[in-house]
Amino acid sequence: MALVSADSRIAELLTELHQLIKQTQEERSRSEHNLVNIQKTHERMQTENKISPYYRTKLRGLYTTAKADAEAECNILRKALDKIAEIKSLLEERRIAAKIAGLYNDSEPPRKTMRRGVLMTLLQQSAMTLPLWIGKPGDKPPPLCGAIPASGDYVAKPGDKVAARVKAVEGDEQWILAEVVSYSHATNKYEVDDIDEEGKERHTLSRRRIIPLPQWKANPETDPEALFQKEQLVLALYPQTTCFYRALIHTPPQRPQDDYSVLFEDTSYADGYSPPLNVAQRYVVACKEPKKK
């Protein structure tokens, strides 16, 4: 029943989102007329080579209207973004519910492990669809935006993706990409699934062995302070794997859609670092260990 209810709510939200998109276009069409008037007024002023009281008053009115139009369009877009966030949240809840139902349904045969190529594609899609933080003027980026860590009392929710420090088969420790199953306030420990094993490899880990992944991309053009900076030590997901390794930031993103360029620690190279490789904001987190000398 819960899945049916979620489907119904998602359908409602999609209808509301469609209406908001139509409103955005209508608002934009209305504002275009005013913007054309502003441009024409400036052209007349240049032709006459003077700023008369008439033009000054006219421009003030036109710009006031343009500002109000832009704010109205911005408000509609923010409402649309809220709808998208709610839809994504419901889809995630539905995925988790289906996963739990599958785990406890003995009448169905066990699922086959996901093909590696499919998993890598899903990880890329997750990075691409990570929402960009768009704050109002004066707003500071929140925790889990880009390089900003979670607050000290933050508890990751079931379904959240994290970097988890686990013991490998050989006895060494490594950071893996994992999904939170649950958190116990009594023991202060997480249960997480190795993302590469689809729930077959479950780990119970203390909070200090868990690093929540970013929930928003930071915009380099408006919030550069929310990004890791050049030569900063991080843990980054090595391309085409599900493991995090130590790396130095080579180049931070310059535009919202850009990835980090990082140098992974690699003793097979003379300087101890790999050539630059691209890693999405979604899969770069702080490394608390010191740099290797």
Swiss-Prot record:
Residue span(s) of domain SGF29 C-terminal: 152-293
Assembly behavior: Interacts with dimethylated and trimethylated 'Lys-4' of histone H3 (H3K4me2 and H3K4me3), with a preference for the trimethylated form (H3K4me3). Component of some SAGA-type complexes. Component of the ADA2A-containing complex (ATAC), composed of KAT14, KAT2A, TADA2L, TADA3L, ZZ3, MBIP, WDR5, YEATS2, CCDC101 and DR1. Interacts with (methylated) CGAS. Interacts with TADA3L, GCN5L2, SUPT3H and MYC.
Record-level GO cellular component terms: ATAC complex; nucleus; SAGA complex; SAGA-type complex
Positions of modified residues (N6-acetyllysine): K288
Region (Histone H3K4me3 N-terminus binding): 194-196, 240-243
Feature type site, description Histone H3K4me3 binding: Y238, Y245
GO-annotated biological processes: negative regulation of transcription by RNA polymerase II; regulation of cell cycle; regulation of cell division; regulation of DNA repair; regulation of DNA-templated transcription; regulation of embryonic development; regulation of transcription by RNA polymerase II; response to endoplasmic reticulum stress
Protein's gene: Sgf29
Residue numbers spanned by region Histone H3K4me3 binding: 264-266
Keywords linked to the UniProt accession: Acetylation, Chromatin regulator, Coiled coil, Nucleus, Transcription, Transcription regulation
Keyword Cytoplasm listed: no
Protein's job: Chromatin reader component of some histone acetyltransferase (HAT) SAGA-type complexes like the TFTC-HAT, ATAC or STAGA complexes. SGF29 specifically recognizes and binds methylated 'Lys-4' of histone H3 (H3K4me), with a preference for trimethylated form (H3K4me3). In the SAGA-type complexes, SGF29 is required to recruit complexes to H3K4me. Involved in the response to endoplasmic reticulum (ER) stress by recruiting the SAGA complex to H3K4me, thereby promoting histone H3 acetylation and cell survival.
Protein name in UniProt: SAGA-associated factor 29
